[in-house]
Design a protein with these regions (language model features):
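Beta->alpha turn/N-cap motifs
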Residues: 61-63, 73-74, 78-88, 183-184, ...
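Short helix-initiation/N-cap motifs at beta->coil->alpha
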Residues: 57-68, 159-189
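Periplasmic-binding protein-like
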Residues: 137-146, 251-273
């Protein structure tokens, strides 16, 4: 009996391995959190397996190499960026190397955080505020500060504007806040240096912050930023209508994938589907 059971188990295992080997591979570049985590979640991988595919997720430490790796065919797709970032990449390369944002998956809201304050009502005049030092993210930070009533911004400024602290006049900043421009990825670790800081969703998650719990304020999920800065899966134009991309889209936009994002990231990752 034991020999028969062992043979049955061996047969089941061999069939399972054979089935796994039959799955077609989709190689996707991603940053660690939350992108690679989402791709490697049971919600996504199980659905892909049903559709006949499995993922080879290549984790990158930074953004610089991810788009070129898709352009040159090293990776089949990537998942780490919003459309404005992709547009800026496409503007720097030959047409043959340009990529397409095939579909959006999620949005990472900016939040206002503090190491010392429990609410924005505690913020004193003249306080120090850390903001990202790159144009698109500093714009988002200043617009969020305006949305919660701490400052005002030039008339007509919106999600597609480019703003820096130098655009905020004394009249727009009657409480005399002092803005410190810092590399976005450093803001979580330097949070104790400021009274408040405006931090990207992915960097907040990396630092162990829970946006829905720890943020003093968050960008509205129905804001223009939620559309403009939704994170997309990027591919070569020739792959837009491929079967493997359709399978990847299906797997990333199921109700199970939505539930995983909502349960795991506490408001730091908002599904856009």
């Amino acid at each position: 009996m034991k020999k028969i059971l062992a043979l049955v188990l061996a047969l089941v295992l061999s069939l399972s391995l054979a089935a796994a080997e039959d799955l077609k591979v989709i190689r996707v570049g991603a940053t660690a959190a939350p992108h690679a985590e989402i791709l490697e979640s049971e919600a996504v991988t199980a659905k892909l397996a049903e559709l006949g595919y499995k993922l080879d997720v290549v984790v990158y430490d930074g953004y610089v190499l991810e788009n070129p790796a898709v352009s040159d065919g090293t990776d089949m797709a990537n998942y780490f960026q919003h459309q404005p970032y992709l547009d800026s990449y496409n503007a720097t390369v030959d047409e043959k190397d340009q990529l397409v944002g095939a579909f959006s998956v999620h949005y990472e809201p900016f939040g206002i955080y503090s190491d010392s304050l429990k609410s924005l009502e505690e913020l004193k005049d003249g306080a120090y505020i850390g903001v990202p030092n790159d144009p698109s993210n500093e714009t988002r930070a200043l617009l969020l500060l305006a949305a919660v009533g701490l400052i005002s911004v030039p008339e007509g400024a919106n999600a597609e504007s480019v703003l820096t602290k130098y655009d905020i006049t004394d009249e727009m900043n009657p409480r005399g806040f002092k803005f410190e421009e810092v590399a976005a990825e450093l803001l979580p670790s330097t949070l104790p240096d400021y009274d408040i800081a405006v931090i990207n969703g992915n960097y907040a998650i990396d630092a162990g912050l829970k946006p829905a719990v720890d943020a003093l304020a968050l960008e509205a999920s129905d804001s223009a930023f939620a559309v403009l800065y939704a994170n997309v899966v990027a591919v070569r134009a020739e792959d837009v209508d491929s079967e493997w991309l359709a399978a990847l889209k299906t797997a990333l936009t199921t109700e199970e994938a939505r539930q995983y994002m909502n349960d795991t990231y506490a408001g730091g990752v908002v599904p856009t589907f």
